[in-house]
Amino acid sequence: MSQADLPEPAPAFQLKGSMLAITVLELAHNDIERLDEQLAAKVEQAPDFFNNTPLVLALDKLPEASREIDIQALVALCRKHRLRTLALRASDAAHLEAAAALDLPVLPPSGARERKVDPSSKTPAKPAEPTYRPTRVVSTPIRGGQQVYAQGGDLVVLAPVSPGAELLADGNIHVYGPLRGRALAGIKGDTTARIFCRQLAAEMVSIAGQYKVAEDLRRDPLWAEAVQVSLSGDVLNITRL
């Protein structure tokens, strides 16, 4: 048998595109001691959220005078609070050098991927037609550690959502039972998305990146009630169903 007659081996891997919800820790000040204290407080509020959570460290918003920061100590501090640093978001040369030394990937600064539009263009590009996907319906309980994502549409869960579970949707999220895990609606920036549930007992709710954690939610008079969550500006509103 010649080499050409040999069957091709089955592929050992596939490269697939994926949209993952990654937490971004955006530093506003170069104060590791204060960061340690405030992260500890956040962990106490939502311990299940800080459980080997993947993280992007964003250093691009630091003031110019505060950019000399010990990145190795910063990554160690995040690990101490069970946050796993996947990458840095930075442009400062010293930050890029430190990232290379730690073998951390670097993402471009916020807004760096935006393209300038030439106003003199005579023929504007035709916008892409939106892709509509059917609502994703889940009828079984969502256990702790599970993640369910409805890409391009709404997510409907007809069963309880346990602590440690995570619901993600580009559109709305409906839970016809107790919501005890995390629910993130409008994760691609849809500010009109909403979250509906029969019983609000969530670790976190988020719409288009604006969120409230369990400690904030427990202080709401509608805690443990049937509610809807909507976004007005940068404020999450919780109202009775």
From Swiss-Prot:
Residues 109-135 are annotated as: Disordered. The keyword Cell cycle applies. Keywords: Cell cycle, Cell division, Septation. Pfam families: MinC_C, MinC_N. InterPro entries: CAP/MinC_C, MinC, MinC_C_sf, MinC_N, Septum_form_inhib_MinC_C. PANTHER family: SEPTUM SITE-DETERMINING PROTEIN MINC. Interacts with MinD and FtsZ. Belongs to the MinC family. This is Probable septum site-determining protein MinC. It comes from Stutzerimonas stutzeri (strain A1501). The lineage of its organism: Bacteria, Pseudomonadati, Pseudomonadota, Gammaproteobacteria, Pseudomonadales. The gene is minC.
